[in-house]
């Protein structure tokens, strides 16, 4: 036993002084960051607004249009309903903002709906929230990028047939930027976000000035493709209004993002995140009302060929000139950048769920740039697949959207309401430490419980309306998918739990010493690689048996002669193979030895293995080690060891 004289322990810490080498990876994504650099990778309120709010802010580019597309079923006369619906959506936004502002201060470690549900509602609601949010983040990328592509097509119709290719390329670009790290991606996305906000407020402000002065006219050559496709008009019913409202609530997706990413903010984290949330809600509500009101006034029509933003911009500025192109460019960029909110939160949430054992644990490991690289790559792959399947159509993707996020809204706020109820039962000075936060008495617990409870009811109603009104349009896919995902989460968790049980040391009884160590050395010939493997085998045991499967009698005779010269006295067993099989006779021989093995005996199969200079050359050699490893992977007390021999 080696005991350190200074510490008196067998456990020693050693500084490897390792510095990562420069490579293509470092050129693309930057130098690797040490764990100690993590505090420097946090962001302030200005960058935080760009990173975590681009999804919510950009939704004004498609949410008003989706409302009009539903109302178009009753004709253009029904478009006036969109304005009161926009006010109703803003009212719901206020409720959500108040609720999530409380969540941010109650859970400074972040986690959002997943952590809140886990701590207050239980394991099953937490997994439902995780499934809902992860689904929503994937759809956020697909919808945002597809909407951005729609803006490009509005300005440049020649690119219509390249929508899918452009969309996938945009996803890959965002993935590359995010793999460089939170701080760098934050700076990269800040400029486009503020560029969009400035251009939109100029457009809305100028439009309102022209409206007030009576100089804002009607949109010229409004696209009628979608309206003309309505051969039979429907009456304005409560169902139609609710369906339009449900489509408009997609503007609220992304509100929860800041509460999920609190740990990315500089200290004081909760304060900075809370202020960012309030600022985001104020900007979002203002743009939603402004765009809906002006679009309704100028007679803009919903269309697959030209977006509402495009019609509003060219009408406000009276042309498709430079200001129009600036607005279209800014909107396109922010819609693509909106996907970044999902790239910021999906990896964090999947890491949380993975660390709890409900997703592969690899998702919880940070990459060289202190980001959850595997989560970023997984999100990119799935979102790209959706863009391909749905041909980058926002209208086809929207019905899948929002159910997941409103389900997570409902669970998060219900969990917070339950948390405040628990807080109200605490006595002065009493504390309860939970996994995600610490419960302390709060004199305002009743008011906070009412706010969260009312918010939970509101979002549950919206979710139900969305599920019913959008069911046949595609919402049924998400309704079926969520239970399937939750089942998969539990299957993964069951695997990890069973593995932990088998690896547990609690009931472990140390096995006796190995009484006999038998080494089997399969050889196909006698050469330097064989002798290197034999030399290693002799360090393990004196009980070594070389084995050759005889397929060619003349070749076997040559091997036998060489072995007598180079085998160093080690016995060689020749296995006859009349059917010219290699693996099966060898496995049969090992099985025979295994049957005679005593309780504390162990068998090691030492396999010589060529390592060619060129990777492609592996295809020219038999993969005996791999085949044996697969054959014995479930066999107890049989060890497969490869001895590589580098061929220079």
Name these PLM-found stretches.
Residues 223, 362-373, 411-471, 502, ...:
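C-terminal membrane-solvent junction of multi-pass transporters and transport-like membrane proteins
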Residues 123, 163-168, 264-286, 354-388, ...:
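Loop-to-transmembrane helix boundary motifs in multi-pass membrane proteins
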Residues 207-218, 275-311:
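Extracellular/periplasmic helix-exit of transmembrane alpha-helices
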Residues 1-38, 498-507, 511-648:
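Cytosolic C-terminal regulatory domains/tails of membrane transporters and channels
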Residues 68-109, 113-118, 122-127, 143-170, ...:
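Extracellular loop-to-transmembrane helix junctions
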Residues 194, 201-253, 469, 473, ...:
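Helix-loop-helix junctions that connect adjacent transmembrane segments
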Residues 174, 179-213, 276-280, 398-410, ...:
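Membrane-interface loop-to-helix entry segments
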Residues 2-64, 70, 98, 109, ...:
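Membrane-interface "cap" regions at the ends of multi-pass membrane proteins
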């Amino acid at each position: 036993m080696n005991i350190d004289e200074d510490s008196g322990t067998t456990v020693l810490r050693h500084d490897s002084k390792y510095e990562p080498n420069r490579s293509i990876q470092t050129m693309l994504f930057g130098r690797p960051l040490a764990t100690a650099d993590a505090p420097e990778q946090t962001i302030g309120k200005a960058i935080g607004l760009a990173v975590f709010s681009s999804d919510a802010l950009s939704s004004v580019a498609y949410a008003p249009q989706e409302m009009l597309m539903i109302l178009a079923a009753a004709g253009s006369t029904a478009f006036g309903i969109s304005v009161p619906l926009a006010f109703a959506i803003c009212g719901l936004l206020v409720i959500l903002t108040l609720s999530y502002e409380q969540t941010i201060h109650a859970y400074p470690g972040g986690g959002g709906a997943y952590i809140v549900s886990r701590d207050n509602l239980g394991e099953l609601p937490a997994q439902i929230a995780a499934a809902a949010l992860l689904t929503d983040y994937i759809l956020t990328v697909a919808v945002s990028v597809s909407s951005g592509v729609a803006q490009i097509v509005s300005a440049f119709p020649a690119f219509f047939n390249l929508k899918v290719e452009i969309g996938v390329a945009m996803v890959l670009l965002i993935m590359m930027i995010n793999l460089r790290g939170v701080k760098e991606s934050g700076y990269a996305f800040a400029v486009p976000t503020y560029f969009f906000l400035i251009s939109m407020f100029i457009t809305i402000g100028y439009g309102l000035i022209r409206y007030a002065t009576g100089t804002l006219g009607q949109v010229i050559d409004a696209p009628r493709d979608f309206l003309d496709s309505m051969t039979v008009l429907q009456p304005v019913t409560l169902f139609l209004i609710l369906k339009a409202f449900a489509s408009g609530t997609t503007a609220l997706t992304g509100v929860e993002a800041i509460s999920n990413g609190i740990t990315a903010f500089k200290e004081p984290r909760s304060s900075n995140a809370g202020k960012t949330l309030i600022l985001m809600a104020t900007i979002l509500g203002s743009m939603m009302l402004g765009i809906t009101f002006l679009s309704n006034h100028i007679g803009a029509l919903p269309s697959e060929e030209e977006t509402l933003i495009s019609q509003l911009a060219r009408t406000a500025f009276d042309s498709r000139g430079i200001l129009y192109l600036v607005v279209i460019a800014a909107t396109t960029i922010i819609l693509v950048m909106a996907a970044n909110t999902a790239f910021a939160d999906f990896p964090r949430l999947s890491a949380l769920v993975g660390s709890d054992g409900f997703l592969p644990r690899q998702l919880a490991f940070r990459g060289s740039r202190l980001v959850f690289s595997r989560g970023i790559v997984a999100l990119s792959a799935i979102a790209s697949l959706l863009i391909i399947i749905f041909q980058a159509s926002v209208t086809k993707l929207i019905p899948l959207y929002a159910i997941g996020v409103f389900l997570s809204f409902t669970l998060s706020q219900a969990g917070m309401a339950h948390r405040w109820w628990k807080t109200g039962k605490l006595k002065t000075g009493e504390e309860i430490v939970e996994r995600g936060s610490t419960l302390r008495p709060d004199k305002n617990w009743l008011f906070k419980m009412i706010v969260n409870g009312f918010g939970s009811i509101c979002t549950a109603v919206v979710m139900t309306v969305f599920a019913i009104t959008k069911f046949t349009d595609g919402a049924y896919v998400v309704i079926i998918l969520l239970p399937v995902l939750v089942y998969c989460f539990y299957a993964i968790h069951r695997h990890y739990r069973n593995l932990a049980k088998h690896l547990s040391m609690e009931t472990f009884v140390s096995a006796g010493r190995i009484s006999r160590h038998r080494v089997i050395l399969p050889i196909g010939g006698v050469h330097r690689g064989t002798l290197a493997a034999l030399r290693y085998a002799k360090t393990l045991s004196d009980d070594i048996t070389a084995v050759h499967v005889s397929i060619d009698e003349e070749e076997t005779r040559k091997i036998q002669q060489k072995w007598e010269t180079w085998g160093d006295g080690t016995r060689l067993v020749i296995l006859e193979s009349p059917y010219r099989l290699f693996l099966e006779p060898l496995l049969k021989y090992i099985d025979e030895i295994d049957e005679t093995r005593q309780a504390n005996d162990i068998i090691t199969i030492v396999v010589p293995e060529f390592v060619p200079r060129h990777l492609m050359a592996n295809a020219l050699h038999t993969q005996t080690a791999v085949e044996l490893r697969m054959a014995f992977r479930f066999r107890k007390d049989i060890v497969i060891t490869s001895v590589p021999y580098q061929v220079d």
